[in-house]
Amino acid sequence: MSRYRGPRFKKIRRLGALPGLTNKRPRAGSDLRNQSRSGKRSQYRIRLEEKQKLRFHYGITERQLLKYVRIARKAKGSTGQVLLQLLEMRLDNILFRLGMAPTIPGARQLVNHRHILVNGRIVDIPSYRCKPQDTIMARDEQKSIALIQNSLDLSPREELPKHLTLNPFPYKGLVNQIIDSKWVGLKINELLVVEYYSRQT
């Protein structure tokens, strides 16, 4: 299944706020109306919708998400927590959380167009897994700096998660540590996602 490129508001109306996909918010009560129209949701549908929230928020394909679930299963610790850490430490998501891009698709464009340096080197892979002590900044080019400056000027001043630090001049981000689950940027029940895949395999 390919990456979603359809109407974004349609997704947030059904699944709730997906800040990585769009900074628009569903109208108050719209999700409740949708639920009442569709009647009682089955356990399968509840798990499916949690999985879809994860996919659309982080802007990944079904195949990519399944790959992350398999990696998380093999790691030490809670599979759900490890899964969220893997997704949160992607370069495109880190740029979004720093405010250097308005959405994760916007961050992916920055990376694909070679505007971003990690530890002084161009990285053009949005799924690049960031590590503690990685530094992330714009290339020393006017267009790259202008794109990030524009995003920072327009983004709401929200508290940065504790695993990140942003120096606004010269637009340099630092990964301090692996993210703690309470700082994940999405309201999600990751255990339902793990359950969804455990029943598919």
Swiss-Prot record:
In this chain, the stretch annotated as Disordered covers: 15-43
What task does this protein carry out?
Component of the chloroplast ribosome (chloro-ribosome), a dedicated translation machinery responsible for the synthesis of chloroplast genome-encoded proteins, including proteins of the transcription and translation machinery and components of the photosynthetic apparatus.
Gene that codes for this? rps4
Q: Please name the CDD domains in this protein's record.
A: S4
Q: How does it assemble?
A: Component of the chloroplast small ribosomal subunit (SSU). Mature 70S chloroplast ribosomes of higher plants consist of a small (30S) and a large (50S) subunit. The 30S small subunit contains 1 molecule of ribosomal RNA (16S rRNA) and 24 different proteins. The 50S large subunit contains 3 rRNA molecules (23S, 5S and 4.5S rRNA) and 33 different proteins.
Q: Which UniProt keywords apply?
A: Chloroplast, Plastid, Ribonucleoprotein, Ribosomal protein, RNA-binding, rRNA-binding
Keyword field contains RNA-binding? yes
Q: Where in the cell?
A: Plastid, Chloroplast
- Which residue numbers delimit the S4 RNA-binding domain? 89-149
Q: Give the family from UniProt.
A: Belongs to the universal ribosomal protein uS4 family.
Name the UniProt record assigns to this protein:
Small ribosomal subunit protein uS4c
Question: Which GO terms fall under molecular function for this chain's record?
Answer: rRNA binding; structural constituent of ribosome
Output the Pfam families linked to this UniProt entry: Ribosomal_S4, S4
Question: Which GO cellular component terms, listed alphabetically, does the Swiss-Prot or TrEMBL entry include?
Answer: chloroplast; small ribosomal subunit
Q: Which GO terms describe its biological process?
A: ribosomal small subunit biogenesis; translation
